[in-house]
Amino acid sequence: MKVIIVAYNQFELLQMEIEALRLLAGIEERDLIIVDNGSEDGLRQWLEERPGMNYLICDEGGESYSAIVNYAKAEFQIAEDILLLNPCYMILPDSIEEMQRLLYADREIGAVMPKLIYNGSETAGNYTEAVSYIQEGKIAPEVNLQQLKLTDGCVMLKRSMLEKVGIFEEK
């Protein structure tokens, strides 16, 4: 599986996300594709200093999400499942493994999404601290855990579905 993360001025969140993916899902840098969509927060320089990191730079910024995903798929010749992930969402323990299990629970399933907890602009200092906040119930007071909504911030796409669909509509 390849993980595509599109970031725009989310350098610190991206670093936390990469660490969470490594710690909780065993996803290594070679399985990541980071897309900097015109950030001005030092992300580009950081990516250029990491020789094992797969990345794309969209200099103009503001590229459509589907155009970026199409570009990443073509540039890195992705021929496996893809996890599209927004850096402002936190991966919880076992969530990627569970998504993979559900993705292959039926041959007709082409994509799965988890329930997500979005904690606004509040961020923890590191991933361990963030997980502790959730375990202790110290998340944003306005978040109702009984009414979580699905979002496109995290979606896992099956390779066979991607082959059938082809490129994503870029309008």
PLM regions and their residue ranges:
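Acidic donor-binding/catalytic loop of UDP-sugar-dependent glycosyltransferases
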Residues: 42, 88-102
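Short beta-strand segments
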Residues: 5-6, 34-35, 86, 112-116
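Cell-envelope/extracellular polymer assembly enzymes that use nucleotide-activated donors
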Residues: 1-2, 31
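Glycine-rich, basic loop-to-helix element that forms the pyrophosphate-binding segment
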Residues: 59-76
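A conserved acidic beta->alpha catalytic loop
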Residues: 36-44
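Short, well-formed alpha-helical segments that are part of the catalytic scaffolds
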Residues: 10-24
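Acidic/His-rich active-site region of diverse nucleotide-sugar glycosyltransferases
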Residues: 67, 98-166
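Short beta-strand-to-loop acidic/aromatic patch adjacent to the donor-nucleotide binding site
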Residues: 79-90
